[in-house]
Every structure is written in C-alpha cells, then in structure tokens.
Amino acid sequence: MQLNSTEISDLIKQRIEQFEVVSESRNEGTIVAVSDGIIRIHGLADVMQGEMIELPGSRFAIALNLERDSVGAVVMGPYADLAEGVKVKTTGRILEVPVGRGLLGRVVNTLGEPIDGKGAIDNDGFSPVEVIAPGVIERKSVDQPVQTGYKAVDAMIPIGRGQRELIIGDRQTGKTAMAIDAIINQRDSGIKCVYVAVGQKASTIANVVRKLEEHGALANTIVVVATASEAAALQYLAPYSGCAMGEYFRDRGEDALIVYDDLSKQAVAYRQISLLLKRPPGREAYPGDVFYLHSRLLERASRVNEEYVEKFTKGAVTGKTGSLTALPIIETQAGDVSAFVPTNVISITDGQIFLETDLFNSGLRPAVNPGISVSRVGGAAQTKIIKKLSGGIRTALAQYRELAAFSQFASDLDDATRAQLEHGVRVTELMKQKQYAPMSVAAQAVSIFAAEKGYLKGVELKKVGDFEAALLSYMNSEHAALIKLINETGDYNADIEAELKAGLDKFVATQTW
C-alpha cells in the first residue's frame, strides 16, 4: 500500500496530537547515615509517616521518624550494601500486603511473599498493614463460641468469636501447643486461621507447619513468619501483616482466628528500632508508645455487625456478621506478670489464660491455673451444654486447691472435707489432655457430666484417664445419635440429661475400675 506525502504528513500530525507525556513526580533524597538497619535520609520533603521508601535493588524502608532536616527510616531486609550518598525515592504508598483465599495453606514472610517453595500466590488484592479498628457502632457483642478443644479452657475460660484472649506464661509451659491445638480444632468449624510467628527459630516454625499439615489444618491456615534472624523491622511488622490477612475474612462476613506467637518478641524488636532511632526510652527501656503498639493491633480483633459487612462488600454479602478472634501470646520471666509488657497486654485483652511452670512440671498439662485465669466476655458465647455442666468444675478446683493447702497442716479431716479433696483431685486429673488431641463438644460434655454427677468417685486416680478414654469410646459406639446431636446443636435438656445418665449408668455397671 502506497502512501502519498499528504497522508504521511496527516498521520504524523495525528500521532503527535495523540502522544501523551506521562511524567512521574517523585521526591528523591540522599542517604546521609547507615547503622544497624536504620538509615537517615536528607532531602525528602513530603514523606508520610509509615510511607514506603524505595531503595536500590527492589528493597524498601519505612519512614518512622520525621525530623526537621532528615528522615529516620528502618530497612526491611539486608542493608550491608547501603552507604552514604545513595539516592532513594518516596513511593506515596503505605506498606500493603497481599490478602485473599489464595494465601490459605501457604507460609509467607512479613511482606506476604511465599517462602514455602510452592510457587506464586494467587491473591485477591492488597490491604494496608495499618488499618483503623472498627468503631463502637460497627461492632456486635460476642455470643458465638470458639472451641479450642481443651476441656480446661472451654469449660472454665470460654472464648467467643471476636474476643482477645491472652495466653501468658514462662517459656516451656505449653503456650504455643495450646494455640496450635486451637487451630487444629478449627479444621471443620469454618473458622479460617492465621498463625504469626515472631522471633522464633526457623526449625521451630518448620515443626509447627509440619504438625498443622499432619493434622489436616494447614489448608485452613495462613502462616506468617518473621524468624529471629530477620531484621527487627520485619519482626515488628509481622503481626500487623497477619492481622490484615485475617481482616480479609472478617470484613466479608466470615470468622477468623489469629495467633500472635509472641508479642513479647515483637515489643523487643520495636524497642530495638526505637532506641536506634534515638527515641527517648521509658520503663524497661521500652519507648513511650509501646502500649499503643499492642492496643492498635489487638483492637482490630472484633466481631462486626451485618451493616458493616454489607457496607464493606457493597451489598454483595448481606445478613452476616464477621469476626476476628485473637490469641496473643506473652512470655513472662520467672512468672512475673507485673512486668511492663505483660501488664499492658493484660489490660488490653478480654481475659487471660495463665500457664504455670510448677503445674507443667507436676504433669498437669495443659498447665492452666484456673484461679487466676479468666474470660471476661466468653461466658455469653459458651456452648449451652458446656455452660450448664461446667459450673461446678471451677468451684471444685478452687476449693480443692484451698483444702489441699490446708490439709498439709491438719492431720484429722472430716468426711465432707475428704470427699471434696477426693473429688477435686479426680477433676484435676480429668482436666489433663494430650497435645494434638483436641476434643469435640460432645466428648467434653460426656467427661464433664461424669465428673459433675459423681461417676469418678470409685475410680482409682491413676485410672481416670483410662476411664475417660473407655467411656468416650463406649458413648461413640452405643450412643452415636446423642453424640451427633450434642455436636450439632450444643443443647442441654432433660431428655439429653436422661440419655447421658442412662449411658453412664450402663457403662459403669459393665466396667470395674
């Protein structure tokens, strides 16, 4: 096809008219100091607090200190090759992480990048790591249970959907084990889980991931990892990243559970960053805003009402509430719960589960101290049958502790006191539970019913565990319909009580303990 000169001229004019110059205006600065992962930048005039700053080599830093003549930023990743004079740019973006169902079953780092070798993640979009928590009007009261699978917790310290329940104790008292069992117990509950590992050994995290996979819970879980060898900035931000991933489900009318393991290490990482940024230290050398560090994170765990979900999804989801339940973990030193970070988190959360070294070493596992453990809002969410049956359990254990201490000094005890001690020691034995063996609502109900109605009275102490195992096996085979009904409805009425009693009477009559 031949073009004459006029056509060529017109074509060139048309192209010139359609040509658009896309100019990108970005503020550029120069690094003036580098030390311990902190960079000072001169020349960034309009940078935001928390903004991502682009460094050479596809890396980013986060602006934390905005000063008169410079900006203090923390590098997310390796910083050995950064030096004075290196040019950096603002991005105009706050840190965002990928969110969506594609993250379920995956292990990711703080930035949401996969580290499990399973290829790229198919995410549904991005969400800022720092989000303002839902307001008072957008929330709904906690009235649905989260079953942990532990008798001691579900009976005495119940947790509801949207609650923040602290797990606190010294090292090696079973804190992580309790949280992992709670995640394993959500396999069939529809609750999506997020496990955030902060400042732990990579081998420990690999073991947790392997256990979740073995028990079929990994497909329902997102694992966010910031190991002890990673930069303090990544350890500090990991809980916020995990929270953003959990909020994806909450805001769409679903239920999610997030475990922060643990927030003590996050506070230490934040303290390190703050001291390097030359912020004034306070109590235990923590900065003044360490309370806000945890409060703004834990306030995001909530149960939101139908209107919030409908507004967020623009009418795509109606008539559904969403929830994000948080299980933060705090490690104490020598049982000192009055230290700075433990007292902060205790005051923020809706209750706490105390795990004690002495109980753990004596063989009582989970090592829950029922005397000082409490759930401030979970009672309203407790399953009906467990709530009705477990009323006497806490009382029996509290009285047993008191009488056990007293009986050490008294040689002659009356029959009533002796009976209370016998009952208490058997209930304590019944509360023991193996790791990775969460129990269903019906199994817990049968065990607690046996304790409450005196069926453990003639059982030898060392045979209580065998008695429970045999009883549950018998009830599952002989009263399968009842077990199914309790698991599905959680109801408790005269008919269910009568059938439980008949089943236990028959079981006890055919067994010798």
From Swiss-Prot:
Q: Where is this site: Required for activity?
A: 373
Q: What is its EC number?
A: 7.1.2.2
Instruction: State the annotated membrane topology for this chain.
Output: Peripheral membrane protein
One GO cellular component term of this record is:
plasma membrane
Q: Where does ATP bind?
A: 169-176
Compartments, record wording: Cell inner membrane
Q: Name one GO biological process term.
A: proton motive force-driven ATP synthesis
For whether the record's keyword set contains Electron transport, the answer is no
Gene Ontology molecular function terms on file: ADP binding; ATP binding; proton-transporting ATP synthase activity, rotational mechanism
Any one Pfam family here would be ATP-synt_ab_C
| Catalytic reactions of this protein | ATP + H2O + 4 H(+)(in) = ADP + phosphate + 5 H(+)(out)
Q: Which UniProt keywords apply?
A: ATP synthesis, ATP-binding, Cell inner membrane, Cell membrane, CF(1), Hydrogen ion transport, Ion transport, Membrane, Nucleotide-binding, Translocase, Transport
Share what the entry says about its subunit structure, partners included. F-type ATPases have 2 components, CF(1) - the catalytic core - and CF(0) - the membrane proton channel. CF(1) has five subunits: alpha(3), beta(3), gamma(1), delta(1), epsilon(1). CF(0) has three main subunits: a(1), b(2) and c(9-12). The alpha and beta chains form an alternating ring which encloses part of the gamma chain. CF(1) is attached to CF(0) by a central stalk formed by the gamma and epsilon chains, while a peripheral stalk is formed by the delta and b chains.
Q: Briefly, what is this protein's role?
A: Produces ATP from ADP in the presence of a proton gradient across the membrane. The alpha chain is a regulatory subunit.
The name this protein carries in UniProt is ATP synthase subunit alpha
